Regions:
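Short, functionally critical alpha-helical segments immediately adjacent to catalytic or ligand/cofactor-binding
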Residues: 1-2
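Compositionally biased amphipathic helical and low-complexity segments enriched in hydrophobic
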Residues: 26-27, 167, 176
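Globin-like tetrapyrrole-binding proteins
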Residues: 181
């Protein structure tokens, strides 16, 4: 982790790309998707829901729990627990085999989960509530969301797009547009990938 290559950015550079398009000389770090455990725990952390208690019994229904994903109960014989299906959807290795490196897949079911699952809807609601507690107006809330999720401030274009989206909502419920906006941000590649 202390090597110069490991600490490199994933930022694209035209000159370097023209010389080494496949990045064999490691002129930048290749973006990599977070594993399902880190991603789920990050979602709970940014929504201020993560239960950081150490130890205790494993959890059979991890999508209904606020415990760290480390405590998910998994089965070595198949789909015995709800956690098995959720974790496998995002490339958790099979418990029946030794796996030296996890595969990384991008399949439609993952995106359907991000758009439609009760788990993601609840995280979006919790993020919306947190942003309304911690910031006074939409501009401040957008800035806070970007700092929580991406560890940076939004660009002017991102800020304007967010304000436009939130002001264009026809919903009478104050939090609903924020839930939708938060769900989009939490489902973004920038949140799911280490850059």
């Amino acid at each position: 982790m202390a090597s110069a290559t490991y600490q490199m950015s994933t930022r694209f550079q035209s000159l370097a790309f023209s010389v080494d398009g496949d990045n064999e000389l490691l002129w930048r770090m290749n973006p990599r998707r977070k594993d399902v455990e880190s991603w789920r725990d990050s979602l709970l952390m940014v929504t201020a829901e993560l239960d950081s208690e150490r130890g205790g019994p494993p959890v059979e229904e991890i999508t209904k729990s606020k415990r760290r994903t480390l405590y998910a109960k998994v089965s070595r014989v198949g789909s015995e627990f709800e956690s098995d299906e959720f974790l496998r959807l995002f490339d958790f290795p099979s418990m029946r085999a030794t796996v030296s490196k996890r595969p990384s897949s991008i399949v439609p079911q993952q995106f359907l989960f991000l758009m439609n699952s009760p788990f993601m809807v609840e995280r979006a609601k919790a993020l919306s509530e947190r942003l309304h507690r911690e910031a006074e107006n939409d501009q401040e809330r957008i800035g806070r969301a970007y700092r929580l999720l991406f560890s940076r401030s939004p660009s002017e274009e991102e800020l304007q797009m967010g304000i436009l989206f939130l002001s264009g909502s026809s919903s009478s419920a104050k939090l609903l547009p924020w839930q939708q906006y938060g769900q989009v941000l939490m489902s973004s590649n920038e949140f799911m990938y280490v850059r």
